[in-house]
C-alpha cells in the first residue's frame, strides 16, 4: 500500500548569490495506492521539484508530504527514482550496477539469484547480453535503459520517474511504455511520472496533473479503461478531446509567458504531428 499526500507544499531554491527563487507554491494533491499519475507542464513549472521532494532528496519550505500517513523526512526503501539522465557507477559493469541497487532493497538473495534478477530486467528493457559491459561502452539511450532496469529490479512500492524516456529512441520508448503498463497491471505499484509528452501521459496514466506557475492548475482524471490498446486510444473521440484540451492549456500558458522554454522538436519522433502549422509542439506519436 502506497498512498501519497502532498499538503500545501511550497519550495524555494537559493542560488550562489543568495537570491531566492520560488519553485512550488501551495501544492496539494493525493495519489492513491496503485495509481499511475503523470505530471506535465512547461519547463520550470515545478515538475521535477515535486519528484525530488517525494523522493526525500529535498524538503519543502512549508507543508508536508505523507506516504501511508507517515511524514517523509528523507529517502526511503519504499521509493526509487529514475532521473532524466542515467545514473550509473562508471567503474561497475552493468550487471554490478543492477546488483548494487537490488541489494539495497532486497536482502538474502544468493549470488545466482542476484545475477538472474539483473539479467531478467535487462532483457525486459531490451538489453540482453550487456551484463559485463561498462557504461562507457553503451550509448546514452542504452545507459538510460540500464538505469531503468535497475530501478525496476529494486522492486520498490513507489516509482518516481523524471522524463525517463527522453533520451531513448522511439521504438524502445514504446517498449518501455508497455513494460510500465505490464508492471502496473502485475504489481499495482504507485507511479509518479514526469513527462513533456502529452500522448505518453494519456496512454500511461490514470490521472494527469498539469502544472503552471508553480502550482497544479488542472487535475485530469482519464476515462480510459485498462488494458489499453494504442490503436483504440488514438481512434477515440474522447482521447482526441482530452488531448486537445491539454494542448490548449500549453498554448494559453505560452501567450501569457514570454520566457517559456519549448520542448525541442529533435528530441521526439519525426512522426509527431504539429498542432498547428509551424508552431512548436509538445506531443509525440504513440508508435
Labelled PLM ranges:
Residues 153-157:
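A short, proline-enriched helix->beta-strand linker immediately N-terminal to the Walker B motif
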Residues 110-130, 182:
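Conserved ABC ATPase "signature" region
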Residues 40-42:
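The feature captures the beta-strand-to-loop junction immediately N-terminal to the Walker
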Residues 63-74:
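Conserved ABC transporter NBD signature motif
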Residues 55:
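Helix-to-loop junction immediately C-terminal to a conserved catalytic motif
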Residues 82, 148:
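Hydrophobic anchor residue at the start of the ABC signature
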Residues 95-103, 112-115:
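Short helical segment in ABC ATPase nucleotide-binding domains corresponding to the A-loop/adjacent helical element
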Residues 134-138, 142:
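Conserved ABC ATPase signature
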Amino acid at each position: 500500500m502506497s498512498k501519497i499526500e502532498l499538503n500545501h507544499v511550497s519550495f524555494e531554491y537559493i542560488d550562489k548569490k543568495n537570491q531566492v527563487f520560488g519553485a512550488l507554491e501551495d501544492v496539494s494533491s493525493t495519489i492513491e495506492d496503485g495509481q499511475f499519475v503523470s505530471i506535465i507542464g512547461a519547463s520550470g513549472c515545478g515538475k521535477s521539484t515535486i519528484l525530488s521532494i517525494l523522493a526525500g532528496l529535498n524538503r519543502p519550505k512549508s507543508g508536508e508530504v505523507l506516504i501511508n500517513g507517515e511524514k517523509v523526512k528523507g529517502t526511503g526503501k519504499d521509493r526509487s527514482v529514475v532521473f532524466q539522465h542515467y545514473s550509473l557507477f562508471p567503474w561497475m559493469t552493468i550487471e554490478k550496477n543492477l546488483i548494487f541497487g537490488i541489494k539495497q532493497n532486497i536482502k538474502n538473495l544468493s549470488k545466482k539469484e542476484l545475477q538472474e534478477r539483473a539479467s531478467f530486467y535487462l532483457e525486459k528493457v531490451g538489453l540482453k547480453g550487456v551484463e559485463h559491459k561498462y557504461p562507457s561502452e553503451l550509448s546514452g539511450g542504452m545507459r538510460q535503459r540500464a538505469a531503468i532496469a535497475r530501478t525496476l529490479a529494486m522492486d520498490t512500492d513507489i516509482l518516481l520517474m523524471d522524463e525517463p524516456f527522453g533520451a531513448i529512441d522511439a521504438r524502445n520508448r514504446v517498449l518501455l511504455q508497455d513494460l510500465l503498463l505490464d508492471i502496473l497491471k502485475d504489481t499495482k505499484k504507485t507511479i509518479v511520472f514526469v513527462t513533456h509528452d502529452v500522448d505518453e501521459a494519456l496512454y500511461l496514466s490514470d490521472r494527469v496533473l498539469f502544472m503552471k506557475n508553480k502550482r497544479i492548475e488542472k487535475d485530469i482524471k482519464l476515462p480510459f479503461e485498462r488494458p489499453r490498446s494504442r490503436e483504440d486510444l488514438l481512434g477515440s473521440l474522447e482521447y482526441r478531446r482530452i488531448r486537445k484540451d491539454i494542448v490548449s492549456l500549453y498554448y494559453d500558458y505560452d501567450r501569457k509567458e514570454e520566457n517559456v522554454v519549448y520542448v525541442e522538436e529533435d528530441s521526439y519522433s519525426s512522426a509527431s504531428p504539429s498542432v498547428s502549422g509551424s508552431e512548436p509542439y509538445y506531443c509525440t506519436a504513440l508508435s
